[in-house]
Amino acid sequence: MNTQQLAKLRSFVPEMRKVRHIHFVGIGGAGMGGIAEVLANEGYAISGSDLAPNVVTQQLVALGATIYFNHRPENIRDASVVVVSTAISADNPEIIAAREARIPVIRRAEMLAELMRYRHGVAIAGTHGKTTTTAMISNIYAQAGLDPTFVNGGLVKSAGTHARLGCSRYLIAEADESDASFLHLQPMVAVVTNIEADHMDTYHGNFDNLKETFITFLHNLPFYGRAVMCIDDDVIRSIIPKVGRYITTYGFSEDADVRITHYEQKGAQGFFTISREDMPDLDVVLNAPGRHNALNATAAVAVATEEGIADEHILAALLNFQGTGRRFDFLGNFSLEHVNGQEGEVMLVDDYGHHPTEVDATIKAARAGWPDKRLVMLFQPHRYTRTRDLYEDFATVLNQVDILLLTDVYAAGEAPIPGADSRSLCRTIRQRGKLDPIWVSDVENISSILAGVLTDNDLVLVQGAGNIGKIARRLAETKLQPSLSED
């Protein structure tokens, strides 16, 4: 950002008093790195720590940030404030050192709230679809020339980054309910895509607590703000009477204010009509597969319509939507000749979905777009607690594919829970009589295992939120060839 642009920004977003140097503990995460990127472009000195380099840290270094690949007390030297990821424990040496030095220690959402304080904030919350919906809204605003700032939990492909600093008053941000820290946000517009049981440890295992937290989040809106809510979701429908704010509903339901009709999927694109009260219908071509993405797009349309963005910009942004990282991410078609000597090719897709509802939506999108393909899924469960709490749902959803390979659970720092592991899940699915799942004890052998099961016209879906994305990229880089990917 040049001096003139920064001066324009400072006309409505003042500096944070004497804060000059901001340190991030766990800076390599997408959400943390995105905020750091925006602040770096605003002119703040940025430092941070994490355990290993990745794309996020590389981008920040290119912006002038100082990154430490360790956690040591001296890393916070000269910091004005320390921002902490939810993945970082309270006994981290940098946090201890900051508290001893009386340096403020805040959570990621508190810093995001500070970015939003003087801007027109659009916050996207919900159990599923936040990242994609955030990207769609950001793309529409950019298409309309509104130059928004955005902070997303995933890669926005059109921008090549998780976050971007714009010169306008608009800030579009993904709002994370996993630790209830989204309650720090005070947006002008709030989207809630759906509400399901997830991250229940935060809510003491009580679903009513989760619902009440979402209601509180919506009441952070000013009385003149706008809640955009998916009325197809039964939980959202149940809480609407408790939300004392202006509401726009959206969905396939007949009583939705912004309604989807005539949905059809052809390959990776969705075709549908959106009807709006007292406005012309929109015939949408969405460059993203699945009914779930039609819902995400309709949330974006509702927000854009509320802001008065012209239909031509809305339609162009959705037609040209490039997607987000690891959300039905097409990695290529690969010949089987060098994989197992067969003729033909297979399609490789990478997807982040790790909740049964998300996995189900991805499977349905794959079936609808490529009905003639056999679906081969490599699934990595994420967290033992989630596997335990949603065990039967996982068994039911995973039973829909044609070939299933299961890796060990990605623990994300959790201790193993008996009966909530991948081998148990394999046994349960096998007992249902349709599939004979393959347990992958060592992901280093995955290419050889795939070579033994793949045939022409298969769709290989690599699914999960842990390190399985790295496996997907390696499979693509080596074109699924065992001898290359397992050297």
Swiss-Prot record:
Localisation per UniProt entry: Cytoplasm
Record-linked SUPFAM superfamilies: MurCD N-terminal domain, MurD-like peptide ligases, catalytic domain, MurD-like peptide ligases, peptide-binding domain
EC number assigned by the record: 6.3.2.8
Keyword Transmembrane included in the entry's annotation: no
Pathway where this protein functions: Cell wall biogenesis; peptidoglycan biosynthesis
GO molecular function: ATP binding; UDP-N-acetylmuramate-L-alanine ligase activity
One Gene Ontology term from the biological process aspect of the record: cell wall organization
Entry GO terms, CC: cytoplasm
Catalytic activity: UDP-N-acetyl-alpha-D-muramate + L-alanine + ATP = UDP-N-acetyl-alpha-D-muramoyl-L-alanine + ADP + phosphate + H(+)
Binding site for ATP: 126-132
InterPro entries cross-referenced by the UniProt entry: Mur-like_cat_sf, Mur_ligase_C, Mur_ligase_C_dom_sf, Mur_ligase_cen, Mur_ligase_N, MurCDEF_pg_biosynth, UDP-N-AcMur_Ala_ligase_MurC
Keyword entries, A-Z: ATP-binding, Cell cycle, Cell division, Cell shape, Cell wall biogenesis/degradation, Cytoplasm, Ligase, Nucleotide-binding, Peptidoglycan synthesis
Enzyme class: ligase
Gene3D superfamilies on file: Mur ligase, C-terminal domain, Mur-like, catalytic domain, NAD(P)-binding Rossmann-like Domain
Family: Belongs to the MurCDEF family.
Function: Cell wall formation.
Protein name (database record): UDP-N-acetylmuramate--L-alanine ligase
The organism of origin for this protein: Proteus mirabilis (strain HI4320)
